[in-house]
């Protein structure tokens, strides 16, 4: 009996052990299955993030960035930085990416700072290149990643459509030996230089607003003779001007508008009426324009100290109310006029689009030597980030999302575009005019606000507030003055930019620079 009880007890213990072993084995198999499932899901999430425009990374990806900052006030709200602002927070929310800026320089000092890093082979993961020679050096030394597959998998359909709208040449400018090594900024047409005049000075002197350039010169001469903006011990400034006379597609204070009114295109290759390709600086039209500028200088209309001026110095003259005339692009109210308006709301700057019969449409040949590009350091494990960021900022947030209020507010606040990581703009070629047409339609009631893109809606709100109050904010004034007043001039005039033909670095017909 005792032996039977012992056997029975041993059987019970053995059964329990086997039961527990079975449970443990089952739990381990279940845990292994859960682990494999989670691993597979995680790998799938990473794969989706790395191969789609808007896929979110399962873990935060931090990338180092070389950033170009604006020369003036960034207008970022207090407490916000280039690493923590509405753009970076939105990108972290949608993509789970975060930039860490390892160097920041203004446009004037950026190329020099980058060249030092290139020589030292100490490059950030992602950075901007604004000098063609530097880009070619990076390519020759195999220092940047191939982005061909990144563009195919992570560029949204709309972003590809934007690039394709410029023809093959734009993307080809960043392509070397069949590989896309640099993402170019789109060459959005900013329109011609407008003449900005102090209309309050015109009224104060009892003058008539100009209808021609010669009318405008008469007005500026009157500013000079009446010492407008000058203190007792100062000389009046006149028409301020960049020392180089000729500007780029995105700079103010040049004399391009005067050259163009003579049918001249200096420092550019053009096709003349006889069908010949000639250098614009050497044409008869350019000589006539230079003769006009010499006459303006002799009459005291052109700033007598223009040859000694720097961009910042010219900007200070405008902001401090020392001058009442300069040529600038449509966004001039954002920079520098907004800073003057903040100090003196009586300063009534008005743009004028003044053309003459001498102006003619020509075929202009352009290079990409002054273009900006975004590149990725060779060996960085997430090169797709650049295309994802561009797709979110310039497609998803503007056309698809409904949670971009904080970012949209930056447009009305006139936050400098350099607050965006990557610091290039990607948009349709005629985006400037399209936005203004849509805003005006909404203001006039022929388009619903809901039909506007995010950027259009933001400017629409600011312009509507401007029209609805006697004391608009500085930002509302700048939005209306730039988008409606300035661009509106060009829309109403049915402005068409000169036809441009882009050429690559290897173009054998035309030299890249005049030796």
Language-model segments: what does each one mean?
Residues 1-10:
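Bacterial N-terminal signal peptides that target proteins for export
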Residues 23-216, 260, 277-281, 401-403, ...:
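Conserved N-terminal structural module of periplasmic/extracytoplasmic solute-binding proteins
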Residues 294, 346-356, 362-440:
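Polar, glycine-rich mid-to-C-terminal structural blocks
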Residues 48, 396-514:
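Conserved small-residue motifs centered on glycine
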Residues 148-153, 175-253, 271-317, 322, ...:
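Helix-loop-helix "hinge/cap" segment bordering the ligand-binding cleft or interdomain interface
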Residues 18-22:
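C-terminal motif of bacterial Sec signal peptides marking the signal peptidase cleavage site
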Residues 136-149, 336-361:
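Ligand-binding "clamshell"
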Residues 274-303, 350-360, 444-455, 459:
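Glycine-centered hinge/linker elements that transmit conformational signals in sensory
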């Amino acid at each position: 009996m005792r032996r039977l009880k012992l056997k029975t007890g041993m059987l019970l213990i053995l059964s329990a052990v086997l039961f527990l072993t079975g449970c443990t084995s089952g739990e381990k198999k279940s845990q292994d299955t859960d682990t494999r499932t989670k691993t597979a899901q995680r790998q799938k999430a990473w794969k989706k993030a790395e191969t789609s425009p808007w896929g979110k990374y399962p873990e935060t990806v931090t990338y180092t960035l070389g950033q170009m900052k604006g020369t003036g006030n960034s207008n970022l709200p207090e407490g916000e930085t280039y690493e923590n602002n509405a753009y970076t927070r939105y990108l972290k929310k949608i993509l789970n990416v975060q930039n860490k800026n390892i160097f920041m320089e203004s446009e004037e000092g950026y190329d020099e700072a980058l060249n030092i890093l290139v020589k030292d082979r100490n490059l950030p993961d992602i950075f901007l290149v604004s000098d063609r020679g530097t880009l070619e050096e990076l390519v020759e030394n195999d220092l940047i990643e191939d982005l061909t597959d990144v563009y195919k998998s992570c560029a949204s359909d709309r972003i590809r459509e934007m690039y394709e709208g410029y023809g093959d040449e734009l993307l080809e400018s960043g392509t070397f030996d069949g590989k896309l090594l640099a993402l170019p900024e789109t060459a959005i047409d900013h329109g011609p230089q407008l003449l900005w005049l102090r209309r309050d000075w015109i009224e104060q002197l009892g003058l008539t607003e100009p209808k021609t350039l010669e009318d405008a010169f008469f007005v500026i001469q009157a500013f000079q003779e009446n010492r407008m903006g000058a203190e007792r011990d100062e000389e009046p400034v006149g028409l301020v001007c960049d020392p180089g006379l000729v500007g780029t597609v995105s700079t103010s204070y040049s004399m391009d508008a005067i050259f163009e009114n003579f049918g001249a295109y200096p420092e550019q290759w053009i096709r003349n009426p006889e069908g010949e390709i000639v250098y614009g600086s050497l044409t008869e039209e350019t000589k006539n324009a230079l003769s006009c500028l010499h006459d303006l200088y002799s009459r005291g209309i052109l700033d007598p100290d223009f040859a000694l001026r720097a961009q910042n110095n010219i900007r200070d003259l405008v902001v401090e109310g020392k001058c009442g005339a300069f040529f600038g692009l449509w966004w001039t109210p954002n920079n520098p006029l907004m800073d003057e308006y903040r100090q003196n709301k009586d300063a009534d700057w008005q743009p004028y689009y003044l053309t003459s019969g001498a102006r003619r449409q020509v075929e202009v040949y352009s290079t990409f030597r002054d273009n900006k590009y975004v590149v990725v350091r060779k060996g960085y494990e997430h090169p797709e980030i650049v295309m994802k960021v561009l797709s979110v900022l310039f497609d998803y947030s503007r056309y698809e999302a409904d949670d971009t209020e904080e970012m949209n507010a930056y447009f009305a606040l006139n936050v400098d575009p350099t607050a965006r990581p990557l610091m290039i703009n990607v948009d349709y070629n005629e985006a400037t005019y399209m936005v203004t047409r849509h805003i005006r339609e909404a203001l006039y009631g022929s388009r619903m606000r809901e039909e506007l893109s995010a950027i259009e809606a933001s400017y629409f709100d600011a312009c509507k507030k401007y029209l609805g109050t006697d004391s608009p904010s500085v930002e509302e004034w700048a939005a209306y003055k730039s988008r409606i007043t300035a661009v509106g001039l060009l829309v109403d005039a049915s402005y068409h930019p000169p036809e441009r033909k882009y050429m690559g670095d290897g173009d054998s017909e035309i030299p890249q620079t005049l030796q």
